[in-house]
Amino acid sequence: HDDAVGQQLPDDEVLGRAVAVEETAAVNAEYLPIFIKRGIAAELLDEKLAQFDLARLAAELDAGRDYQFGYLGLQTLYDRYFLHIKERRIELPQAFFMRVAMGLALNEIDREARAIEFYQVLSSFDFMSSTPTLFNSGTCRSQLSSCYLTTVPDDLDGIYEAIKENALLAKYAGGLGNDWTSVRAMGARIKGTNGKS
């Protein structure tokens, strides 16, 4: 039998992998509802996730897709993306993808069907959402945007308000772009102080 890199695998390793996938599938199916309830109780997940048919979604989890990851990919998910309580990760890879998919499907008419569709493309790596979506989808802070563009007004209050807004937006992993064209040039007259900028 050949694996992904074309090396010969002994039959017992192939069988062992098949058993591992089957065992992982059972764990995933049992784990998803527990994970959702625990995440809601810890105020990490949106309470609306409990309204999904969790058994139906759990049945769609494909444990074999965990084997698509290389070490670095899985470690990156663990270090940066998986939800945690006091540094203890509470997400498994397939639960992570389903949580993101559920968050994206919250307002859909047939949310379970849409969540399954989103899960299929995410977990198969056919499409990968941006970092803010992976961080925040399905959570209590469902900010999914990757980038914010703002215009900074030409007055002191407006400039400091723009800085405050940037800090609040950056908190949830969105990129920032500011249009400063309305701010007067260096050396221009400041009416309120009769000075120069």
Predicted region positions:
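Extended catalytic cores of very large enzyme megasubunits
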Residues: 1-197
